[in-house]
Amino acid sequence: RGARGETEGRWSREAPGAWACGVERGGCQHECKGSAGASNCLCPADAALQADGRSCGLPAEHPCHQLCEHFCHLHGLGNYTCICEAGYQLAADQHRCEDVDDCAQLPSPCPQRCVNTEGGFQCHCDTGYELVDGECVDPVDPCFDNNCEYQCQPVGRSEHKCICAEGFAPVPGAPHKCQMFCNQTSCPADCDPHYPTICRCPEGYIIDEGSTCTDINECDTNICPGQCHNLPGTYECICGPDSALSGQIGIDCDPTQVNEERGTPEDYGGSGEPPVSPTPGATARPSPAPAGPLHSGVLVGISIASLSLVVALLALLCHLRKKQGASRGELEYKCGVPAKELMLQQVKTERTPQKL
């Protein structure tokens, strides 16, 4: 029994090694070989006997990892398959990997032009199209839905800038808007095409000869107590050596008036210096008192204003006389048209004999 017990213990699955080969093949997974009263389990050449002495398993370093170019997939006892990376296919020898010409596939993986690369491919679009999310689409117009007041001009593939018509320039701080601009002594006026007599000029200019804008020479009005330089659409005043603001550029050289009009030195950050006048076309110009020769356009404006005042006074006089109950003939003579004057003369001629 003891021997049998030992034999039974030796045959148990807990005991390592093979049993007698005549009993269920010694418990070996692959092959059992007995010699000189001892039994041993054998495994295939590409497998190794495991710790229990009966099972067969893959060795730690399987030779397929050196045989396959990319990857080795083990399945079953001693079996393997070589696998290639994406973009490659297994060669005829079942071990090497060859590049796949993706562009030769049908349908083509690209919407327009396909360029095959090692292990992959690249999609390109025809001239005038852009590749967006794998699709070739018309490029987005940089000027689409712009807010330019006059005209939009593309800059590159995605930017744009607003341009203005001749005689206009972008407004500083609002480049989508345009304002009249003249950097010369005279420029064409901006006239209404339906009403050619209605024209406008840039700031610092005046209508002259109907459709021409002429620069106003502010220096002729003695507005600058120092050295005055007339500029297109504006002017600059350089204070003289007898001024507390000597050498500074502004619109007034009296420090008292400068401080009253522009604020205290604290308003300038404690420097005590008045700000430099802005660039031409943006100068805040005070209303100069006419002290020099007037321009022809100014004289025309004064004449029109005077004539309008006379007409208004005559109309007021007529209205007052009507309220006072003046005779119709006298009022019509003063305020009526020439046709009514002839009728009044006939009436007066007829009334004279009646009075006699």
Curated annotation (Swiss-Prot):
Residues passing through the membrane, by range: 297-320
Residue ranges constituting the EGF-like domain according to the UniProt record: 17-57, 60-98, 99-137, 139-179, 178-214, 215-254
Coarse class of the protein's main subcellular location: membrane
GO biological process: blood coagulation
Membrane topology: Single-pass type I membrane protein
Coiled coil: none
Region (Disordered): 255-290
Ranges of the Extracellular topological domain: 1-296
InterPro entries assigned: cEGF, EGF-like_Ca-bd_dom, EGF-like_dom, EGF-type_Asp/Asn_hydroxyl_site, EGF_Ca-bd_CS, Growth_fac_rcpt_cys_sf, NOTCH1_EGF-like, Spindle_Org/Thrombomodulin
SMART domains, per database record: EGF, EGF_CA
Keyword set includes S-adenosyl-L-methionine: no
Intervals, Cytoplasmic compartment: 321-356
Disulfide bond positions: C21-C32, C28-C41, C43-C56, C64-C72, C68-C82, C84-C97, C103-C114, C110-C123, C125-C136, C143-C152, C148-C162, C164-C178, C182-C191, C187-C199, C201-C213, C219-C228, C224-C237, C239-C253
Tissue spec. comment: Endothelial cells are unique in synthesizing thrombomodulin.
Localization terms from the record: Membrane
Glycosylation sites: S271
Pfam families (alphabetical): cEGF, EGF_CA, EGF_Tme5
GO molecular function: calcium ion binding; transmembrane signaling receptor activity
Subunit text: Interacts with ITGAL, ITGAM and ITGB2. Interacts with thrombin/F2; this interaction switches the specificity of thrombin from a procoagulant to an anticoagulant and antifibrinolytic protease. Interacts with ANGP1 and ANGP2; these interactions significantly inhibit the generation of activated PC and TAFIa/CPB2 by the thrombin/thrombomodulin complex. Interacts with PF4; this interaction enhances generation of activated protein C. Interacts with HMGB1; this interaction inhibits HMGB1 inflammatory activity.
Protein purpose: Endothelial cell receptor that plays a critical role in regulating several physiological processes including hemostasis, coagulation, fibrinolysis, inflammation, and angiogenesis. Acts as a cofactor for thrombin activation of protein C/PROC on the surface of vascular endothelial cells leading to initiation of the activated protein C anticoagulant pathway. Also accelerates the activation of the plasma carboxypeptidase B2/CPB2, which catalyzes removal of C-terminal basic amino acids from its substrates including kinins or anaphylatoxins leading to fibrinolysis inhibition.
Name listed for the protein in its UniProt record: Thrombomodulin
